Structures are given as structure tokens and as C-alpha cells.
């Protein structure tokens, strides 16, 4: 495995900022995936680290990175435009390091939603997008759905979703939103919450993240590798 920790420069209205990034690749990867953290976590959160390690075991190179607000150690995300600009810089870096591999944009909760907005605006053009717990709406407030942009995304999308996720209730609303997408699937995690925790099961965050990787890899193989 190869690893690099070179920061990424992001162009923001107030000037360029540098964000931390960790690129790790297995021997002979068949895809490269940028993995964004959620709003309340960082690039080194155990869930994200575990998921990335398991993806590499599946043959996928990974690039974990920080959004500018997290790099500045602020708790609340900045403007969406800053996150979208970060996604643009991250995918450019991933393309430089991936040697012609298919590029995938993925993220936990907020990080995935920002990837979807960047794709909908044409700022990034990944081969596919993967959402780990897409935040359909704030918990208990389904009237504030964050889905109007999803039909504009041309790329295939995979939504990994817990059936007990409070950000997705009622599930019928989430299913209806995904049905408006051009090309999208839901992979349900039975009993899973927003971070895919399951009541009555004690698992470390690294393990929870790692257990999602086989579903992600299988879906990506079906979408990115031509059948013979």
C-alpha cells in the first residue's frame, strides 16, 4: 500500500486555504474514491478511517480530506459554496493521483450531500456518487427536504441508508426522493441509525464503517467495470 498526506489547496472568495488530506492506495487499485466526513466529525473519525481501510481491502484507492471549517477547528460547517469548492479541488487531486482510474465521490451525511450539490452544479464529474447516510432533512422536520437538486445529477448514485435513521423518516419520503433521480439505488441497513449503529449491537465505529465497504465495492464493480 502507498500513502501520502499532502494538503490540498482550495480557492475560496476570501483567498486560498489548505486542507488536510490522506491518500492511500492498495496495490493495483481498480477505482479511486474521495471520502468526505460528516458535519460533526473530521477526516480521522474512526468510522471514516475504518470504511476507507475496508474499501482499500476491496481494491479501491481512497482520499480522505477535511472541509475548510473542520481544518480551522470550527464546529459548524461554513457556506455550501466553500464545501463545493473543496469538492472541486479534491476531485482534481484525486484525478492527478489515480492514473486514469474511475473516480468516485463519497461522503458521510453532510459530506455526501455537498458532493451531490457539486455534481448537480457540474462542478465535479465523478463516475459515481456514494452517500453514507444522506441527510434527507433535519430530524423531526421532513418539510425541510434537501433533495431538489438530486434529479439534476446524471451519474449513478448509491444511497446507503439505515432504516432507523431519524434524518430519513418517514422512509416513504426518502424513497420518493430517490425515485426522482435519474439513476439511483438504495442499499438498506436494517435497524441502522444515522451512523449505522444498530440498537442492541455493540460495535466500534471503525467496524461499523468497515462493514459498509463490501456493499459499496460490489455496487461500484457493477457500475464501473464492464462485463465480459
What are these regions (language model features)?
Residues 192, 200-228:
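Catalytic active-site module of serine/aspartate enzymes centered on a nucleophile-bearing elbow/loop
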Residues 153-154, 159-161, 165:
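Short beta-strand/loop motif that positions the catalytic acidic residue
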Residues 48, 146, 155, 168-177:
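Short alpha-helix in the alpha/beta-hydrolase fold that links the catalytic acid
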Residues 8-102, 195-204:
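Serine-hydrolase catalytic machinery in alpha/beta-hydrolase-like enzymes
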Residues 164-168, 194-195:
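Acidic catalytic loop of the alpha/beta-hydrolase fold
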Residues 87-155:
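Primarily recognizes the serine-hydrolase "nucleophile elbow" in alpha/beta-hydrolase
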Residues 179-197:
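Catalytic histidine neighborhood in serine/cysteine hydrolases
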Amino acid at each position: 500500500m502507498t500513502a501520502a498526506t499532502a494538503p490540498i489547496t482550495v480557492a475560496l472568495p476570501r483567498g486560498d486555504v489548505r486542507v488536510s488530506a490522506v491518500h492511500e492506495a492498495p496495490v493495483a487499485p481498480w477505482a479511486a474514491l474521495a471520502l468526505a466526513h460528516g458535519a460533526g466529525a473530521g477526516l480521522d473519525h474512526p468510522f471514516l478511517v475504518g470504511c476507507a481501510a475496508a474499501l482499500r481491502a476491496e481494491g479501491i484507492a481512497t482520499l480522505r480530506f477535511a472541509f475548510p471549517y473542520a481544518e480551522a477547528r470550527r464546529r459548524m460547517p461554513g457556506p455550501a459554496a466553500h464545501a463545493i469548492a473543496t469538492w472541486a479541488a479534491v476531485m482534481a487531486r484525486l484525478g492527478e493521483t489515480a492514473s486514469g482510474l474511475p473516480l468516485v465521490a463519497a461522503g458521510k451525511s453532510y459530506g455526501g450531500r455537498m458532493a451531490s450539490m457539486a455534481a448537480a452544479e457540474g462542478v465535479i464529474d465523478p463516475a459515481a456518487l456514494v452517500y453514507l447516510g444522506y441527510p434527507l432533512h433535519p430530524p423531526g422536520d421532513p418539510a425541510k427536504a434537501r433533495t431538489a437538486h438530486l434529479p439534476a445529477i446524471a451519474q449513478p448514485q448509491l444511497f446507503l441508508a439505515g432504516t432507523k435513521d431519524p434524518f430519513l423518516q418517514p422512509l416513504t419520503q426518502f424513497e420518493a426522493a430517490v425515485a426522482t433521480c435519474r439513476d439511483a439505488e438504495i442499499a438498506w441497513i436494517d435497524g441502522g441509525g444515522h451512523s449505522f449503529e444498530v440498537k442492541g449491537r455493540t460495535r466500534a465505529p471503525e467496524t461499523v464503517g468497515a462493514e459498509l465497504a463490501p456493499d459499496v465495492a460490489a455496487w461500484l464493480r457493477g457500475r464501473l467495470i464492464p462485463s465480459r
